[in-house]
Amino acid sequence: EDLLNEADEAGVKVVLNATVCGMYQDKEITVRIGDEIHHFKGDSIIIATGAAENMVTFPGWTLPGVIGAGAAQTMMNLHGVKPGSRILMLGSGNVGLVVSYQLIQCGCEVVALVDAAPRIGGYGVHAAKVARTGVPFYLSHTIVTAEGDDHVTGVTIAEVDSSFKFIPGTEKHFDVDTKCF
C-alpha cells in the first residue's frame, strides 16, 4: 500500500489485475481491466508481469519443509525467520544461487545445490559466492524423493543421463529439514 501511495504522489498511474492486449509504437498500449478495454499513452510504460514459482513434483514434494525459493526469501526478508537449518537447494539458475547465498547469510547450512542440467545456469559471480562457502554442486543430478512422515527429514538425489532419466546406483542421501527449489 505504501508503494502505491508513493507511486500516486509521483504522478504514476498504477493499474492492477489488468491484461495488456496490445502494444503499439509511441508508448501506447491497450489494456483489459475487468470487462472494459482501455487505451493508455505515456512518456514511459512499465509492465510488471508478476511471478509464480515453478514446482517440481517428486515423491514427498507435498511434505512440510519442501518450499519454493520465493517462500524462503519471504520468510527471511519479510519475517526474519530461518526457513530451516539444513537445506538442499534444487536449481542452479540465478534464483537458486542467490537464495542459497541468502540462506547461508541467514545462518542456514546449505548441504548441496542440485541441478539436472550439466552446467550451472546462473551467473558465474553468483555461483562463485556459493562455491566459496563450501556448498557442493551436483550437476546432472535431480531429486528422487523427499523423505519424512510429518515433515522433511531427508532428500535422495541421483545422477541423470542426457534424457534426464535416473542412473541406477548413483543415489545420494542428505539429512535435511528443508528442501528448497
PLM features: residue spans?
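FAD-binding core/adjacent interface of flavoenzyme oxidoreductases
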Residues: 1-86, 163-177
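Short, surface-exposed, charged/polar-biased interaction segments
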Residues: 63-66, 93-96, 124, 131-134
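Rossmann-like NAD(P)H-binding beta-loop-alpha module
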Residues: 64, 73-119
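Generic serine detector
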Residues: 44, 85, 92, 100, ...
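A Rossmann-like FAD-binding core segment of flavoenzymes
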Residues: 7-31, 104-181
